[in-house]
């Protein structure tokens, strides 16, 4: 370390300079890379993963610098580089981290092609310096002296050999190299031995570079064909057709294909033609199913980087695509294209079965499966099938317990973004969806649809006859409503029924259907209770889950013969009590569904708590009780047969996908 002499001015200013600092920093980066510490990017070449640091890659290569700076606010940590060999890329990475690399004579041409493609000026300059020294050594060689290496001038390509090194030190490839350790590094470090050990572990044998050369990539030449790079005249690369100016004549040649219609790259599977080779490679991923770009948030795989960047906007909620007509913004470009049809008047894709229109063809294709019954996506865990892949991915998150989507208001987590959006509406307090029959308002559209089904089940004959009979007068409608009210007051035991459909019933002794009831989703009058009505031989398959929420700690369970013998599991104080649990289906009654009940049962009040424990029960377990106070009991009916309409005297609710949350399917440990 040296210090420059101070100037005559006062106060004195010292300029401290270290000749070894840059080498020490570079060696430290190399040590961190080999230990896989602080690495923020993984590069995949021929299925070999290379850990690295973005900052050093961007500082060494203009290609990586442009790639990373184009990410804007999206930070991707996994990239796959096509058209390269793992062995050659390992040599390039070694030069970036140590400024020294040892390569075989046969692979130097591949190394220089990759250096030009990645735009690594120091590596290219090191090769040029080595060439100049070799030419000088050939001129000064004495006559009759035996040659140690092949004359470089006899090679077809003078860029056939590279010994990467610092600008101040040059070594010949064929001589035995000394230890390349820099200042501050371990003297026993040998890059050749390190690369050989790494190659035995995970890097494939070097093969000829195919489909990578720049002139191959741009001009459609046969890959692997050696020769000098084409020299274009030193003139401006301007298109004579449209006047556009390009950085090089290579890009100009590609652009001219848009005018000539030339498409030299053809897909061997479907025959589709393309103007550029990389576009063909992206297209071929549709046939192979390859999706190398992985979302770091939800692990969704995509085939192109552009698709990944658009997908990441869904997580960041950045709406970068704005309609020029109305100013509406969208997070994906395809959404904007679909929206533009509203202004252009272009027809939307329409279903031939139900004539429903969709924003794009992809949504229509997904919808058609609802008519054909096709469910091509199967869960490998439980075997359940789905019509859409996105639905399967959400379902798999349920198995894994993953909930990456967080509500910004209450921090509640969800497994899919649509559930979070529906939940966030509840914080606004707005109920924009109203029933046209009874004027009840809902915050969510799916709850309104479920509510409308209850009206359709109440009076289906009236709807069928409405098409044949003329509309009734006002007195006739009032008389019919009075008759319906008299019928609803006839049977109080089945005043309200929440019916579990037969396809949701488990097999005897194999699974349980659990109803999770908390103070957040249930509130009744003081003289009301909850009755669970089951069919024969199904009481052992039904279980109740309650949580300590102040006033919901006891539930009434009723069987058809009046015996309270249903297995009840109560969750109080974090403990689970009951028999050996099997695989369970937990169903949560939504708050909106309870609001529908409250419309017919009055304002919500505190539920009366009744404790009745047997002598054999110990611990904080809620007792099983048959309530005698249920003037208007809310009944949850579990049957294997459809209940006749004459026995349903009140509001009927169907527990289906739209009205309940199908939360989790797992094995429950009684000790947790």
From Swiss-Prot:
Residues 140-152, 223-235 bind DNA. This is Zinc finger and BTB domain-containing protein 24. One of its GO terms (cellular component) is nucleoplasm. It comes from Danio rerio (Zebrafish). Residues 198-208 have a biased composition (Basic residues). Belongs to the krueppel C2H2-type zinc-finger protein family. Residues 148-158 have a biased composition (Basic and acidic residues). The lineage of its organism: Eukaryota, Metazoa, Chordata, Craniata, Vertebrata. Residues 136-208, 453-492 are annotated as: Disordered.
């Amino acid at each position: 370390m040296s210090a420059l002499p101070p100037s005559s001015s006062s106060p004195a200013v010292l300029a401290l300079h270290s000749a070894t600092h840059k080498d020490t920093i570079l060696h430290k980066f190399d040590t961190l890379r080999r230990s896989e510490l602080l690495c923020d990017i993984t590069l995949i070449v021929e299925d070999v993963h290379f850990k690295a640091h973005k900052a050093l890659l961007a500082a060494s290569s203009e290609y990586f610098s442009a790639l990373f700076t184009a990410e804007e606010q999206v930070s991707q940590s996994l990239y796959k580089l096509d058209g390269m060999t793992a062995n050659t890329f390992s040599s390039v990475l070694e030069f970036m981290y140590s400024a020294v690399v040892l390569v075989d004579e046969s692979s130097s041409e591949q190394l220089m092609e990759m250096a030009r493609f990645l735009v690594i000026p120091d590596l290219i300059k090191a090769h040029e310096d080595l060439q100049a020294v070799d030419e000088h050594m050939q001129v000064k060689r004495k006559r009759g002296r035996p040659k140690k290496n092949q004359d470089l001038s006899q090679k077809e390509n003078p860029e056939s050999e590279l010994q990467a090194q610092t600008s101040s030190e040059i070594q010949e490839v064929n001589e035995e190299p000394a230890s390349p350790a820099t200042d501050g590094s371990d003297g026993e470090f040998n890059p050749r031995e390190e690369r050989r050990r790494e190659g035995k572990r995970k890097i494939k044998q070097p093969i000829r570079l195919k489909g990578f050369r720049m002139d191959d990539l741009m001009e459609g030449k046969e890959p692997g064909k050696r020769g000098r790079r084409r020299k274009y005249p030193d003139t401006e690369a301007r298109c004579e057709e449209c006047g556009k100016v390009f950085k090089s004549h290579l890009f100009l040649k590609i652009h001219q294909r848009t005018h000539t219609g030339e498409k030299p790259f053809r897909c061997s599977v479907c025959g589709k033609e393309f103007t550029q080779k990389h576009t063909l490679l992206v297209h071929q991923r549709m046939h192979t199913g390859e999706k190398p770009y992985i979302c770091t948030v939800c692990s969704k795989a995509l085939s192109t980087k552009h698709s990944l960047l658009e997908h990441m906007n869904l997580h960041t909620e950045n709406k970068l695509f704005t309609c020029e007509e109305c100013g509406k913004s969208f997070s994906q470009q395809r959404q904007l294209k679909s929206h533009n049809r509203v202004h252009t008047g272009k027809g939307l894709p329409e279903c031939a079965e139900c004539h429903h229109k969709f924003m794009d063809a992809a949504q229509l294709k997904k919808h058609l499966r609802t008519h054909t019954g096709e469910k091509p996506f199967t869960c490998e865990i439980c075997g359940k099938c789905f019509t859409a892949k996105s639905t399967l991915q959400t379902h798999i998150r349920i198995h894994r317990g993953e909930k990456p989507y967080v509500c910004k208001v209450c921090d509640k987590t969800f497994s899919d973004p649509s559930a979070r959006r529906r939940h966030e509406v509840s914080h606004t307090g707005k109920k924009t969806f109203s029933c046209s029959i009874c004027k009840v308002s809902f915050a969510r559209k799916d709850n309104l649809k479920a509510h409308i089904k209850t009206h359709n089940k109440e009076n289906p004959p009236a709807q069928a006859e409405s098409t044949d009979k003329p509309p009734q007068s006002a007195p006739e409608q009032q008389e019919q409503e009075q008759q319906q009210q008299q019928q609803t007051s006839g049977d109080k035991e089945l005043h309200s029924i929440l019916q579990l459909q037969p396809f949701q019933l488990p097999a005897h002794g194999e699974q349980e259907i659990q109803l999770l009831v908390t103070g957040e989703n249930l509130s009744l009058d003081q003289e009301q209770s909850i009755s669970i009505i089951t069919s024969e031989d199904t009481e052992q398959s039904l279980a109740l889950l309650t949580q300590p929420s102040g006033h919901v700690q006891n539930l009434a369970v009723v069987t058809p013969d009046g015996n309270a013998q249903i297995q009840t599991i109560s969750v109080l104080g974090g403990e689970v009590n009951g028999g050996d649990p099997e695989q369970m289906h937990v169903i949560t009654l939504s708050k909106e569904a309870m609001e529908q009940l409250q419309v017919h049962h009055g304002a919500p009040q505190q539920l009366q708590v009744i404790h009745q424990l047997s002598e054999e029960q110990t611990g904080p377990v809620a007792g099983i009780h048959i309530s005698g106070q249920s003037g208007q009991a809310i009944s949850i009916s579990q049957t294997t047969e459809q209940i006749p309409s004459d026995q349903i005297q009140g509001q009927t609710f169907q527990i289906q996908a739209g009205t309940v949350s199908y939360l989790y399917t797992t094995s429950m440990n009684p000790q947790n």
